[in-house]
Amino acid sequence: MEKPACLIVYTSMSGNTEEIANDIAKGINEAGAAVQIKDILQADPADLEAYDGILLGTYTWDDGNLPDEFLDFYEDMDTLRLQGKPAAVFGSCDSYYEHHGGAVDILIEKLTELGANIILDGLKIDLTPTAEEKEQCIQYGKSFVNDEWGPFSCFN
């Protein structure tokens, strides 16, 4: 079996979601898959169709909303065909707000509407990731690969 290729598309205002994305990518690499990371402003929604697995990351703006820089990408996703494609969503959020991590939920709903197979629960990290949460992010990346394609030995 050929090594799966995963794409992480994210946006980050404070650097927290970027840090989470990098830790998840580390886990994906450690599990034996290839991974590319793109900032939302450098990504095209059509990129999602070209990869074996996709992960979207965002912070939650205000009271549960997607940030402005994700809106065009989000709307342009409507033309995609993601039937059965493994996907997951993560983000940084603030538990102070009532709709904690609402943007993560919005993206899960969109990917589900487009036919993607959400293989992991949304990962919501409160503000800056702690050392323990960074390890959780690495494990999230490993689980994304292992839950869908099996153990690393399949790719040797």
PLM regions: where:
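FMN-binding flavodoxin-like domain, especially the glycine-rich phosphate-binding loop
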Residues: 2-5, 16-19, 23, 27-31, ...
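Aromatic-flanked redox-active Cys/Sec active sites in thiol-based oxidoreductases
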Residues: 10-14
